[in-house]
Amino acid sequence: MRSLTLAALLLCSLLLVFHTSAAEELQAQEGHLMIPGDTDTALETVDDERLFECTFECDIKKEGKPCKPKGCKCDDKDNKDHKKCSGGWRCKLKLCLKI
């Protein structure tokens, strides 16, 4: 019983740390305004909530289009497909993350 409680406590702590770091990253991104003449024109503007959702669910669609580029797969063991990711998407821990 104690080990189950300890495991649950550790899991909650880990989720809190991850959520806090993700929230700080999103807050930092809010200050960055995209100008049409920027070099980031290939990036599709995604609102903060969708960006957070797309970090965990690579197949979520926004306005009928996938959030991540076509061909960006992170489920391979060696992450060899990370070179196919573009537009700010990278493979981290077998997840497609928007950087």
UniProtKB/Swiss-Prot annotation:
Protein name in the entry: U1-theraphotoxin-Lsp1b
Alphabetical keyword list: Disulfide bond, Secreted, Signal, Toxin
Stored Pfam families: Toxin_20 (PF08089)
Keyword Disulfide bond: yes
Family: Belongs to the neurotoxin 12 (Hwtx-2) family. 04 (lasiotoxin) subfamily.
Disulfide bonds: 54-67, 58-91, 72-74, 85-96
Gene Ontology CC: extracellular region
Main location: secreted
